[in-house]
């Protein structure tokens, strides 16, 4: 829905993004590399772009490498999530497995001491105990775990025991 009569430099950011993708695909691109492709777009245009990306990825010969701070976009389109902080890769995991591999629990300080330190990714210390991001497979049965969001996982990986 781009206007042929409108001057390109007068296009909105969303229109320019649509044009950029059309140009990339006109070259029969098999890989798209996008940096903050949906940043600054209104929700309607953002959804259109994400739908376009999902359609593009239906062909197994197509790949998209997308850098984004909008985690809801990654939730919608990513198969794998790589998390890079200060130039260091903290994890690369299939999106669907990411939430299954980790859990959040709240334990007393005594209960935390009984956990294998290798199980703990990060912690928030409170007056009543600690909230932990843990590796599910290293936590004993009986500890109640909640599914973390991708944002939770990223925050705990970066903040660790600093909070």
Q: What feature does the model see in each segment?
A:
Residues 32-36, 111-115, 138-142:
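Short, surface-exposed beta-strand/loop "edge" segments at domain boundaries and coil↔beta transitions
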């Amino acid at each position: 829905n781009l206007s042929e009569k409108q001057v390109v430099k007068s296009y909105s950011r969303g229109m320019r993004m649509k044009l950029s993708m059309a140009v990339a695909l006109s070259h029969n691109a098999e890989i798209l590399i996008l940096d903050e492709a949906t940043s600054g777009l209104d929700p309607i245009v953002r959804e259109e772009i994400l739908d376009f990306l999902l359609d593009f990825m239906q062909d197994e010969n197509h790949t998209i490498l997308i850098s984004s701070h909008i985690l809801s976009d990654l939730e919608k389109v990513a198969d794998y999530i790589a998390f890079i902080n200060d130039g260091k890769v903290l994890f690369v995991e299939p999106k669907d497995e990411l939430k299954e591999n980790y859990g959040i629990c709240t334990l007393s300080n005594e209960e935390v001491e009984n956990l294998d330190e290798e199980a703990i990714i990060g912690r928030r210390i409170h007056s009543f105990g600690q909230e932990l991001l843990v590796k599910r497979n290293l936590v004993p049965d009986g500890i109640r775990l909640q599914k973390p969001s991708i944002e939770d996982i990223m925050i705990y990986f970066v903040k660790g025991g600093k909070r």
